[in-house]
């Protein structure tokens, strides 16, 4: 049984064409929200429009690492729907390579999408969200609590997102706006398949068993419940919670366990 919390609310989601972003879009439209989403893949956005024909869905092709694309997305959302109640910064990209092998512009690309995309969209939507006493959400990662080997740039980008949102939350404490970040833990999505290698190209495969992970749909349901409850943070999956807990209380042991988890026979 769905609540009416999201009914008629305007929700802007970055990266809504697949994975967690698409699951959020699907669920929100089902619950009566008006949804705007952007992504880089025009074909997937077109499929999304077909799937939700007749529903209040606004889509736009945009690369969130580009400020003007973010401006066009946020401005057009307000033009179409009149306001933004909730902004979900979901667009993200990962990487997998040892830092010593890495070309530095790979990290710049990851920071551009994960951190600056969140920064740009939040700044552009902020006045409307404050006016509506709404919510700003960042889809972060366990890598934002604990640096992960082979994912130095990804970890840096998610630590940056968490720090930025924590500072913003404190600034907005008396404004009626809720600021939350979500760490999905290990959730089945395309982020690992599309993770950049040391040269900045997509890996094309996941090093993990995606079938054993939480589904994007289950993750989206948890996120929406947390938005409704106006939570500060949401850490999902047992592995995710355990990693955060261990890193806080036993950081030295966490180093060893994390290394063992990510390295097999000395290889990433």
Q: Residues of each region from the PLM?
A:
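Conserved glycine-rich cofactor-binding loop
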Residues: 10, 17-18
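The beta1-alpha1 cofactor-binding region of Rossmann-like NAD(H)/NADP(H)-dependent oxidoreductases
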Residues: 61-72, 104
């Amino acid at each position: 049984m769905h609540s009416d919390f999201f009914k008629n609310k305007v929700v802007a989601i970055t990266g809504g064409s697949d994975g967690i972003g698409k699951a959020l879009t699907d669920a929100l439209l089902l619950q009566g929200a008006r949804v705007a989403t952007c992504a880089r893949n025009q074909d997937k956005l077109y499929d999304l429009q077909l799937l939700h024909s007749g529903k209040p869905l606004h889509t736009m092709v945009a690369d969130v690492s580009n400020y003007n694309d973010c401006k066009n997305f946020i401005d057009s959302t307000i033009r179409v729907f009149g306001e933004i109640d909730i902004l979900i910064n979901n667009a993200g990209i990962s990487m997998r390579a040892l830092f010593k092998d890495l070309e530095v512009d790979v990290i710049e690309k990851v920071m551009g999408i994960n951190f600056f995309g969140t920064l740009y969209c939040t700044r552009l939507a902020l006045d409307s969200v404050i006016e509506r006493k709404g919510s700003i959400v960042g889809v972060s990662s366990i890598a934002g609590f604990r640096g992960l080997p082979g994912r130095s740039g990804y970890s840096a980008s998610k630590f940056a997102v968490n720090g930025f949102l924590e500072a913003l939350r404190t600034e907005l404490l008396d404004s009626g706006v809720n600021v939350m970040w979500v760490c999905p833990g290990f959730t089945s999505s395309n982020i690992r398949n599309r993770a950049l290698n040391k040269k900045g190209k997509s890996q094309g495969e996941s090093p993990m068993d995606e079938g054993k992970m939480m589904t994007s749909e289950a993750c989206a349901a948890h996120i929406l419940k947390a938005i409704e409850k106006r939570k500060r943070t949401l850490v999902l999956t047992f592995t995710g919670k355990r990693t955060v807990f261990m890193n806080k209380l036993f950081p030295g042991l966490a180093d060893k366990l994390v290394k063992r988890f990510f390295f097999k026979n000395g290889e990433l």
